Amino acid sequence: MSSEVETAEAVDESEKNSMASEKENHSKIADFSDLLKEGTKEADDRAENTQFVKDFLKGNIKKELFKLATTALSYSAPEEEMDSLTKDMEYFFGENWEEKVKCSEAAQTYVDQIHYVGQNEPEHLVAHTYSTYMGGNLSGDQVLKKETQPVPFTREGTQFYLFEHVDNAKQFKLFYCARLNALDLNLKTKERIVEEATKAFEYNMQIFSELDQAGSIPVRETLKNGLSILDGKGGVCKCPFNAAQPDKGTLGGSNCPFQMSMALLRKPNLQLILVASMALVAGLLAWYYM
């Protein structure tokens, strides 16, 4: 009998030691915020090496495209952010902006995933808020805002990126990470959230793929005055610089960057493709500043 008690006590002690060891191992695991950062690093690197992002980081994306960065957010932003977004959208596209933009296939897939998570796995929304605010609005998007803001700076078109109650973005991010690390989640749930954050990168890479495909297709449009243009391919083109000289409307063997840009910007699908990807691009920039 005595030996049985001793054996039971030994088993209990062993289990306690095992649990203590497991707890200690968990404590040695990086903080949740670090798990998110490290867990998405590979996907982030792959996204960073897409052609669109490479061009962006090289400064080959025109500043005018910044206004499109707000559009995708109007589909997926939290309700409390819509007031600022609405002001930006009205500034860029007019009061009837909702009639002028259209969600692309890849962007819609991303939006559908966010809606699914919100309804079925709400804890996984942490992954999307992390990638949006830690990697985007409070980091890379601030860089984008500085690059595209008018001189002198006004608030027009950048309301969404202005956080009146956040005086120091770096300190706020530290506070946000501390809150992340304080979440009462088991390791399995944390790992699933990291997987969801990785999915966010995958969805954005699908959008980048759409961008690359759209950028490789010549865009043909007809101007209001009837002149046909073939943008980016040296075809018929009419720039504002020679608009007063119709006989010089054809630029043999040369490109018309103005019309090329304007024609692309008028394409609703391309607008949404470009815009939906800007948040992640901003996140990629954030890695250089975190």
Swiss-Prot record:
State which residue ranges cross the membrane: none
Q: Which reaction does it catalyse?
A: heme b + 3 reduced [NADPH--hemoprotein reductase] + 3 O2 = biliverdin IXalpha + CO + Fe(2+) + 3 oxidized [NADPH--hemoprotein reductase] + 3 H2O + H(+)
The annotated regions of Acidic residues compositional bias extend over: 1-12
UniProt-annotated stretches for the region Disordered: 1-33
> What are the start and end residues of each HRM repeat?
238-243, 255-260
GO process terms (BP): heme catabolic process; heme oxidation; response to oxidative stress
Enzyme class of the recorded protein, top EC level: oxidoreductase
Q: Which UniProt keywords apply?
A: Heme, Iron, Metal-binding, Oxidoreductase, Repeat
**Which tissues carry this protein?**
Found in the spleen, liver, thymus, prostate, heart, kidney, brain and testis.
Isomerase as UniProt keyword:
no
Q: Where is the composition biased (Basic and acidic residues)?
A: 13-33
User: Which InterPro entries would you find in this protein's record?
Assistant: Haem_Oase, Haem_Oase-like, Haem_Oase-like_multi-hlx, Haem_oxygenase_CS
Task: State the EC number(s).
Answer: 1.14.14.18
Q: Please name the GO terms that the record assigns under molecular function.
A: heme binding; heme oxygenase (decyclizing) activity; metal ion binding
What this chain does, per the entry, is described as: Heme oxygenase cleaves the heme ring at the alpha methene bridge to form biliverdin. Biliverdin is subsequently converted to bilirubin by biliverdin reductase. Heme oxygenase 3 could be implicated in some heme-dependent regulatory role in the cell.
The Swiss-Prot or TrEMBL record describes its family as follows:
Belongs to the heme oxygenase family.
The identity of this protein, by name, is Putative heme oxygenase 3
Organism of provenance: Rattus norvegicus (Rat)
**What lineage does the source organism belong to?**
Eukaryota, Metazoa, Chordata, Craniata, Vertebrata
What gene does the UniProt entry assign to this protein?
Answer: Hmox3
